[in-house]
A protein has these predicted regions:
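Extended, low-hydrophobicity, polar/charged segments
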Residues: 1-159
Length: 159
């Protein structure tokens, strides 16, 4: 059902995007990158957060990025709290490992971390733990109605 909801949203909106499915596991950044033959940071990791108000939000980051608690608190005026595992499917309509900003069960605010802008193409999940969507980064804001933010930790420079 989840992959089908993603496919339907693309078809209904005449979007030139396709859900790619595989037998391989794509539930984690590492396995998704290996399956799709791309670098880990090109996997657009979708993380769900639950605000104190009870509202669920999604934040997309590059695969290796980590949310910076201070930046999150500055943006959302509260501590970062992930959606509890037992609420993910109900909140998004997608299972853990397949959460993406497309074909959601209900409208959710979507935030796109600036780390994604390092790439021309990224690969968010496609609604299951064995799917992905190849998406040009310059399309993300429009198709997700997302807001660009800076909530990830700055990378540590190589020595």
């Amino acid at each position: 059902m989840s992959v089908e909801s993603v496919k339907k949203i693309f078809e209904d909106n005449n979007l030139p995007l396709k859900v790619e499915e595989t037998e391989g596991d794509t539930a984690t950044v590492k396995t998704a990158a290996a399956t799709w033959g791309v670098e880990e940071d090109q996997i657009a990791k979708t993380m769900g957060y639950k605000l104190k108000s009870g509202e669920y939000i999604l934040i997309l980051t590059k695969g290796g990025a980590r949310v910076d608690n201070k930046k999150f608190k500055d943006k959302f005026k509260e501590k970062a709290t992930m959606i509890p595992h037992d609420e993910v499917l109900e909140a998004t309509g997608h299972p853990i490992g397949g959460v993406c900003p497309f074909g959601l069960k209900r409208p959710l605010r979507v935030y796109l971390d600036k780390t994604l802008k390092e790439f021309e193409i990224v690969y968010p999940a496609g609604g299951s733990d064995h799917s992905a969507v190849k998406v040009p980064v310059d399309m993300l804001e429009g198709i997700t109605q997302g807001e660009w933010v800076d909530v990830c930790k700055n990378p540590v420079p190589a020595e």
